[in-house]
Amino acid sequence: MFRLVIFRFFLLLPLMMSPPSYAAWQFLGATSDGTAYLIDPSTKKNKGQLIEMHTMQNLRSARLVNGQKFRSAVGQTLYNCTDKTSATTLIRQFSGELGEGKVVSSFKQKPKEIIWDAILPNTILEKEWQIACVTG
């Protein structure tokens, strides 16, 4: 019996020590249709006057893109802290929730085609900008 307990302990130890893959994601809010918005501050990178971080949308129910269903989208977003603007430069849409499953669609914005959006007050995007530009 004691050996069985010790065996199970060492078998499960790596699982207990490794955090889940979504551990760094912070919930920012949700819309009335149930879409949850998250951000991963651990991906924060300074790029001159810009900050880059990963964002995620997790859908309550699947949507279609190019004839395939997706449940979540992970984006790479740039934040201009001075101008209070943002631009999504990369989007990957996944078949599963929280960025899991297979990539059903991927789109990367070319640098010359980046569209900068103003950050409006009291929005989820403003919460993202605050994490990128205001918090340490």
Region locations from a protein language model:
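Bacterial N-terminal signal peptides that target proteins for export
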Residues: 1-9
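N-terminal secretory-pathway/extracellular module detecting exported/lumenal segments
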Residues: 20-136
